[in-house]
Amino acid sequence: MDTKKEIKNNNFICQIINKDLNENKNLSFYTRFPPEPNGYLHIGHAKSICLNFELASLYKGRCNLRFDDTNPLKENIKYIKSIKHDINWLGYKWHGNVRYASEYFLKLYQYAQELIKKGLAYVDHLTKEQIREYRGTLNTPGKNSPYRNRTIQENIELFEKMKKGDFSEGEACLRAKINMSSSSIIMRDPVLYRIIFIKHHQTQNKWCIYPMYDFAHCLSDSIEGITHSLCTLEFQDNKFLYNWILKNTSVKHYPKQYEFSRLNLEFSILSKRKIKILIDKNIIEGWDDPRIPTLSALRRKGYTPSSIKNFCQKIGVTKQNNLIEFSMLEHCIRKELNQTAIRTMAILDPIKIFLYNLDSNYKEEFIVPNHPNNPEMGTHKIIFTNTIYIDRSDFKEKYDKKYKRLKLGEKIRLRYSYIIHAEKIEKDEYGNISNIICYCDLNTLGRKPKDNKNPAVIHWISEKNTLSAEFKLYDQLFNIKNPEQQENFLLYINSKSLIKKFGFIEKKIGEEIQKKISNNNIEIFFQFERIGYFCIDFIDSKKNQLVFNRTVGLRDTWDSKKIKTKNITNN
């Protein structure tokens, strides 16, 4: 089967591209990813990144990275650096140099002058509030500004005064002269330029007038020779203005805009404004808090580039907005880590076991696999002594027939080791179990017990093979599926979205991590047996205190039968 041919035939965007390329044999596919440098990328941006760069690869075309930096009030160099890092982390390389809309400010200014000279733009002195009031509603037409019918010469002179800084912020703006009764509100004389007196991160203090996004975006696409301008559905109405500007300026190239559905993820918020509220209220730690779906947060949580790209492939590209199951995202990373993560044992909530029939100097070594199905991943050594730790949840004092782990008077097998029998417990002054006294059957290594009944298996670590560690158990930040739709989304915060545990990992494994702790670009993943998949948190870890973030649990709750595996360019 020709996979590329199948991909090209199954996606509405690919069908459009195929048609365009077939009708114009000299056409080369050229697209772009155009973020505004006013925040950090999230999983929704990843869908757009994957789509644009994968299509460029599929059609042997090009994909630019262009920062639409037309609002210096909200932009920052740190966002530019972060966005570039995230794209590279996902494994993509843009064509040529990084581009900025600000590189085209002079050309955009000249296009604005063109519109004025054609009688299609005018300088307005209405305030922002008045412009909103004059615009009308979906049910009522707008009304003309009293400044709408100025002469062309007057508008040329006023626009030049705007450029020179003769007006204060909000005192004047340039508006397109289209139709204040248009059924599309965006076509009711939209603002094209506004005055902002602030230093720009690229052009410094050269300009004090800045083009609006809608004006700069389509013209930047044209200047760069973009053939297919792909954006999400919220820009569908903007297409009218996109095409109007191109039609009424002397551009030599006409890109085409196409829309696809944005990515909406269960139990998540993608809005920058709302995430900032969560940060300001100390509900989350920052933009890389593993409970939110920014790319930096997902990376810190242990998600890999390939798992995110696989997720984007599975959800595909359609024109229908829907809410994507979070369990599908978890499925993608779990499937990968099941193949690649080193197996080791960790105790998150330790309780001590004393094996009374073993001497204090008793020591035995076991060689265990780093992965049960991949011998090439090697092995590591664990030691067995008369004092070990198990997880508190693996012991029950009172008899419970349904409980299959260690119980008083019952037996259990230790992973890779012997069967032990719980005979007595010791408690501290608060009534908590501090020690379990057990008998170790040394005849059961790799063998069944005398009664021929194999008990359940639990994990453990020898007291002499421990290194203390902190474990962060992350869960959904919200307890409803679609918090974005709630007016007061803060009412639905999951109070148990982060639980911290303090326990132990295998000493040798921990010491190897400590050697690498200064290099926070190294990604190390583990399956803590019977617990879940974890990664080292290089931000919070110190040499004397390792911190692990739970990436995902062991149990897969996503029903893969609900959706066929789809390439990023599939429906």
Swiss-Prot record:
The gene is glnS. It is an enzyme of class 6 (ligase). A motif ('KMSKS' region) lies at residues 269-273. One of its GO terms (molecular function) is ATP binding. L-glutamine binds at residues 68, 213. GO terms for cellular component: cytosol. Gene3D superfamilies: Glutamyl-trna Synthetase, Domain 2, Glutamyl-tRNA Synthetase, Domain 3, HUPs, Ribosomal Protein L25, Chain P. Belongs to the class-I aminoacyl-tRNA synthetase family. NCBIfam families: glnS, PRK14703.1. Its main location: cytoplasm. ATP binds at residues 36-38, 42-48, 232, 262-263, 270-272. It is found in: Cytoplasm. Keywords: Aminoacyl-tRNA synthetase, ATP-binding, Cytoplasm, Ligase, Nucleotide-binding, Protein biosynthesis. It catalyses: tRNA(Gln) + L-glutamine + ATP = L-glutaminyl-tRNA(Gln) + AMP + diphosphate. It comes from the Bacteria. This is Glutamine--tRNA ligase. A motif ('HIGH' region) lies at residues 35-45. Monomer. Its EC number is 6.1.1.18. GO terms for biological process: glutaminyl-tRNA aminoacylation; glutamyl-tRNA aminoacylation.
